[in-house]
Amino acid sequence: MSQFPLISVMTFLPLLGVVLLFFVPKQSHSVHRMLALLVSLVTFVVSIPLVTGFQSNADFQFVEKMPWIAAGPFQMNYHVAIDGISLWLVLLTTFIMPIAILSTWTAVEEKVKEYMICLLLLEVGMLGAFVSLDLFLFYIFWEVMLIPMYFIIGIWGGKNKIYAAVKFFIYTMVGSMLMLVALVTLYFKAGAGDFNVLRFYEVTLDPATQVWMFLAFALAFAIKVPMFPLHTWLPDAHTEAPTAGSVILAAVLLKMGTYGFVRFAMPLFPDATDKFTPLIATLSVIGIIYAALVAMVQEDVKKLVAYSSVAHLGYVMLGVFALNLQGLSGGMLQMLNHGVSTGALFLIVGFIYERRHTRLITDFGGLAKQMPVFATIFMIVTLSSIGLPGTNGFVGEFLVLLGAFESELRWYAVIGTSGVILAAVYMLWMFQRVMFGELTNPKNQTLCDLNAREVGIMLPLLVLIFVMGVYPTPFIEKMSPSLEKLIVHVKTKQQGAVAQVETVPAAPQVMPAAAVVPAEHK
Amino acid sequence: MVSLHSYLIVSAILFSIGTIGVLVRRNAIVIFMCVEMMLNAVNLTFIALSRHLGNIDGQIFVFFVMTVAAAEAAVGLALMIAFYKNRESIDVEDVKLMKL
Amino acid sequence: MGYELFGLPMIYYISMVAKVLVVFVFVLLTVAYATYAERKIIGHMQVRLGPMRTGWHGLLQPIADGLKLFFKEEIVPSQADKFAFLIAPIIALVPAFIGFAVIPFGETIEVAGYKIPLQIAGYYDTVSGQVVDMNVGVLYILALASIGVYGIVLAGWSSNSKYSLLGGLRSSAQMISYELAAGLAIISVFMLSESLSLQKIVADQANGAWYCFKQPLAFILFFICSLAEINRTPFDLPEAETELVSGFCTEYSSMKYAMFFMAEYANMVTVCAVTTTLFLGGWHGPAFLPGWAWFIAKVYFLIFVCMWIRATYPRYRYDQLMRLGWKVFLPLTLVNIIVTGIVVSLQS
Amino acid sequence: MLGVYLPIIVLVAVAVIFGLASLTFSSLIGQKKPSAVKLAPYECGCEPVGSARERFSVKFYIIAMLFILFDIEAVFMYPWSVLFKRLGIFGVVEMGLFIVILFVGYIYVWKKGALEWE
Amino acid sequence: METIVLPVINLAPIMPEIILSVFGMALLLVNVFVPSEQKAYLGYLSLVGIIAAGVSIVGGWGVPLDSFSGSVVQDNFALFFKGIFLLSAGLTILISDHYMKREGCNQGELYPLILFATMGMMLMASGTDLMTVFLGLEVLSVSLYVLAGFNRANLKSNEAGLKYFLLGAFSTGFLLYGMALTYGATGTTKIPKIAEFVAANGMVAQSPMFYIGMLLMASGFAFKIAAAPFHMWTPDVYEGAPTPMTAFMSAGPKAAGFAAFMRVLIVAFPTLKADWSDLLWVLAVLTMTIGNLIALNQDNIKRMLAYSSIAHAGYALVGFTAGNAEGAAGILFYMLSYAFMNIGAFAIIILVGKKGEENNNVADYAGFATKHPVLALAMAIFLFSLAGMPPTAGFIGKFYLFSGAIKAGYIWLAIIGVLNSAASVYYYLRVMVYMYMKNPTEEFDWMTLSPAVMLCILIAVVGVIIPGVVPSYLLELAQKAVLL
């Protein structure tokens, strides 16, 4: 514990920004913006040593643990650490934040101070949720995220902002409240101790209990992902949120759901995971196809992108529940990819919306002539989103489908593949309708191309799109050990449970088999 | 001698009459009188039980109940007067400024 | 006399009925002649003769008055609440008469070997060899006084006349105010007697000094408050002719009207009897006269005092009256209790 | 019990019978010539104005409330007065406190003007 | 003539009650002797009384005492609740002056009444005799009847007072009848002795009289804590009463009701836990659900908070149903934090109102955040705490309550609870929607930021946030204070 509390510093740095912002007078908008940007950049810089100092093994690193609440039967710790699973998500968060802040540099004119405070608070919540190893702490951060996001959508959103904000809040709240019940139940089942998730990993619950608790956890996460049919809040929230909100929502918040599955739902309730894998895979595939179909008929660019998110996250879920290394790492990678490319897409939508104050596809057409730089960037991002080889999207989707194909989810993978084609259809069709063709609408003829700030925002994302597409190894390398450990853990417990149910002599046979699993991948 | 049960039954009947009165009457003062009747039914119960058990606590309780009833009566009357002054009525049907 | 009913000998029942009738007739006669006496006494004090025509020195005057009232027309105002209007005089009258039940008016006498205490609500318990009376006799009297108020309020309210209503209200406000002071004043008596039983109080005074000497303040307060409570002059505001016609009984006529008057005089008798019992040693007195004679003498003396006061003092104004009750008598009674408490506990 | 209360009941009966009898008797023998004016409420010979069942001064309510409260306090003093010698000095102190508290209320009421009649 | 030997009387357990009574009476007297322009000092004086009482309870912590032959006790349970009562009374006094001045009410009697009510609550918490509990309850109730109708010129206040009085007196009848029957069945009014009797006599003691007594008592208490289906009085009374009194009623007396209810059920009827747990289960579900559902479509913010307060009683009943230490500690903690957050919210409602026109409609808050960002932030914090969002005291409280239920195996109850709590978010958010997301229709220029009210809000914010982030200390206290 004597080491530098890097994670805490990173997590709570934005809070410092919030405090500073409080003291800045209300009118000095540019100061607010600069300060927020600065803080988020510093946070990003602080988070870089996490990558450089990260040992590529399955252990939790940069651990910080100290007692927090101790009363009655409860013992909660401030326990944070990262492993391969959370590392990249943390990085993604710190990376996206400055971009998000920049994205609404000029779009948000009112209540800039409050806006920046909300963004920074949101960052605290997200980072905290990713690094928490104490379930209670995780829950707190999980809920804390809700509040600033609610305000971001509700105050700075579009026409229908209130409906969207409330819907977002209540959906998430219902899920998370049930998770809380399950969490406490789990705590009492586990016996005296603390809320350390690693401790809960070791608890063996009877399958019936697992089913209920898994359902409660899964509901919370599935709403966040969002999985079909719980996704209805997402298009509303995305459409109404300001660009930065959409970007963060797509890039980070949705990952919270999938991350939850990987970190909590699956390892905690392995038997239930086993039991529900077909259901979740079915829902994921339905999500992929359904969202793609719905996206195809959208009039609104932003809504289209929102539905594409639903489809993308379907892949992630499919990969995660394939429960093998390819699938999982594909899923994890796809999370990052989705963060980058969908984030970028939302930024792009934001750019044209700022110029034209409309997002209807029919209002555009032929923009490519007027805005060549924009068109190029848009093209690259679209291709990345479709998953063209050479871009990041490809690697993720490929691994996911590969993993799913190798697992028992083969047929789901087959159907899911069709989603790739559909994605190409609706994305490209949209791109074509917006960028090519006749420049008919007179309003579009005066549009100016991206300015330096906007290009500057997009550049890092474009770089990442290619880097991750061409050389994903460092990403996968760092996460693999943790994922392997996870797979072993889940599978062992699943089989252990089976062994317990079956005859006793079967147990010794299972143990070496479990030990072999990581060896295969080495 | 009159048995404990008779007392209890009488007080239960009184209590019920009071309760029903509160529920069906409309005049605030009558309602309050019904409440007082309930309290007195309770007092009767206490006295009867106290006598039956040979334990003085019940009688002491009655003292307090009476005191409290008096205080309630004073406050209640004051409230009713205040209400009447503003509204020219003490019908509880008129206590309806704040309905859903 | 060997028969028993509910555990009591027959002679108990016979003596009880006898006592009830004797006392009732006695009170009735006293009431009747108190009216006569009042007119006569005040008349003489004001250097006139008072009633002289009916009988020798007008001795038959009360009977003539009574007969006259019997023959008067009964008027029930058209807007009156008939039932309440009718019941009000009875409610006023009955408590006035039954207060006497707990007052011991003489020593225990012996008839055919059975001891009979001269107190209606009392009997001689052969097992314990003691006179048993109501152990909360004073509370009984206070309770009756409270019931009497209802008669007056009802009379005032049911008549549907403004004078009646105001008279009734004033009268009840006055009565309850002074009832309070009276009730508090006698607490110091109980502190000495350690009992609420009137037998016990009388016995206690026989052994020591009368309470009017031990508790002069309480005595004076109680007597004055009692006068006010029964609307005697100088506190007869409710019937103040100059202000409210006849107060609560403005609309009453005939026997109903008479009953309010009877109630008032009966109350006076009761009050004087209670004062006698509580402060003047009850029926005790030097042995040359029997106890009941002493009792009657003391009561009649107090009744005379009442009339004397009426002849002497002017009537109070209503605000003065209420102020006197609440601002003077009430704190005085409380102070008296505390002082008595301190003195008594210092003595022991 | 019975020995004490039975006579009271008898006395009540006698008093009630006396009252009812004289009422009945007088209403039987008294003359009856009612007229509208005779049955109207008395108002010094003028035509009665309005109903008598109207509001009257709030003072009366206040007196009634004060009576209830002080009377109930008196209720506590009665049992005490019977026992106070046996309670010793403690009893006096207790009742002294009680009366002091009563006095606080009393002074409050006084200063608030509830005892004034104008 | 034998001398009566009196039990030794130790005044220490009722020291705070004595202090409050003395201050209350002193204030009454001071009130009639000082001219009306100096009456503001009464408020400060009453605060001194509250603080003095607060000081007197500190020393008693962890020192169990009883007095008056076991009629009152000083235990941690009582002391914790006393702290809550003093706190809510103190905060209420802080917000009263501003409101009463604005509405033109005579404040003279206000402070003594608050002190007396607080004294009654304390007696309820520390009473271990049904008589003491009853007396405390009535001292409280009678004061509250007056306080609810305190604004005499205001029709709504009249109605609130009258309604509260009639229904309150009615419920007292039930409570008393229950006490009488319990007394009859067990032969004592002392709460621990009732338990002893039941333990000694087993099933023999559990006559119908006994059960009916318990049931009637429970319904009487349920009325006082505004648990459905005995909640009907709450919305009207809360809406009509002067706002500071509404704040007070929702915080202090409710906690007092719980204190007495808990002591009676937990101490007197431990053997019947299965029975009353079932009863409370139903009560809790009804209370939460009805409170929340009706709150959903309230436009008047006071009324909305009234229904929400019903719902909150329901959450507390969840912890009570659990009947274990966590649940009980949860109630204690929750009542404390509820006092902070609710009075805080009402303080802001008071600031927003103006004379005669209280601006209680949710729509009146449109754009409030634009005009008064700090106050709006405070309001948001209170509302989030009421909704049970971390990191606020409201969340920790709810967490404890529901944890208690889960530990006791009432998982469904906890689930109904959390779902309710999720539903409740809707109407709290509604206020925030108006504050933050609508354009201002008013200038809010009539608002005067009275320092006392601001102080109250500040204390409330601190009281909501600090226990929400570092709740250990308070939870520890609550744990030590439970009766189980």
UniProtKB/Swiss-Prot annotation, chain B:
It holds the Pfam family Oxidored_q2. It catalyses: a quinone + NADH + 5 H(+)(in) = a quinol + NAD(+) + 4 H(+)(out). The chain crosses the membrane at residues 4-24, 29-49, 60-80. One of its GO terms (cellular component) is plasma membrane. The keyword Plastid does not apply. One of its GO terms (molecular function) is NADH:ubiquinone reductase (non-electrogenic) activity. One of its GO terms (biological process) is ATP synthesis coupled electron transport. Its EC number is 7.1.1.-. The keyword NAD applies. Keywords: Cell inner membrane, Cell membrane, Membrane, NAD, Quinone, Translocase, Transmembrane, Transmembrane helix, Transport, Ubiquinone. It comes from the Bacteria. It is found in: Cell inner membrane. It is a multi-pass membrane protein. It is an enzyme of class 7 (translocase). NDH-1 is composed of 14 different subunits. Subunits NuoA, H, J, K, L, M, N constitute the membrane sector of the complex. PANTHER family: NADH DEHYDROGENASE SUBUNIT 4L-RELATED, NADH-UBIQUINONE OXIDOREDUCTASE SUBUNIT ND4L. NDH-1 shuttles electrons from NADH, via FMN and iron-sulfur (Fe-S) centers, to quinones in the respiratory chain. The immediate electron acceptor for the enzyme in this species is believed to be ubiquinone. Couples the redox reaction to proton translocation (for every two electrons transferred, four hydrogen ions are translocated across the cytoplasmic membrane), and thus conserves the redox energy in a proton gradient. HAMAP family: NDH1_NuoK. Belongs to the complex I subunit 4L family. This is NADH-quinone oxidoreductase subunit K 1. It comes from Geobacter sulfurreducens (strain ATCC 51573 / DSM 12127 / PCA). The lineage of its organism: Bacteria, Pseudomonadati, Thermodesulfobacteriota, Desulfuromonadia, Geobacterales.
From Swiss-Prot, chain C:
Its main location: membrane. The keyword Translocase applies. It is found in: Cell inner membrane. It is an enzyme of class 7 (translocase). This is NADH-quinone oxidoreductase subunit H 1. It catalyses: a quinone + NADH + 5 H(+)(in) = a quinol + NAD(+) + 4 H(+)(out). The chain crosses the membrane at residues 11-31, 83-103, 136-156, 172-192, 208-228, 268-288, 289-309, 324-344. It comes from Geobacter sulfurreducens (strain ATCC 51573 / DSM 12127 / PCA). The lineage of its organism: Bacteria, Pseudomonadati, Thermodesulfobacteriota, Desulfuromonadia, Geobacterales.
Curated annotation (Swiss-Prot), chain D:
Keywords: Cell inner membrane, Cell membrane, Membrane, NAD, Quinone, Translocase, Transmembrane, Transmembrane helix, Transport, Ubiquinone. It catalyses: a quinone + NADH + 5 H(+)(in) = a quinol + NAD(+) + 4 H(+)(out). Pfam families: Oxidored_q4 (PF00507). It is found in: Cell inner membrane. Its EC number is 7.1.1.-. Its main location: membrane. Belongs to the complex I subunit 3 family. This is NADH-quinone oxidoreductase subunit A 1. The gene is nuoA1.
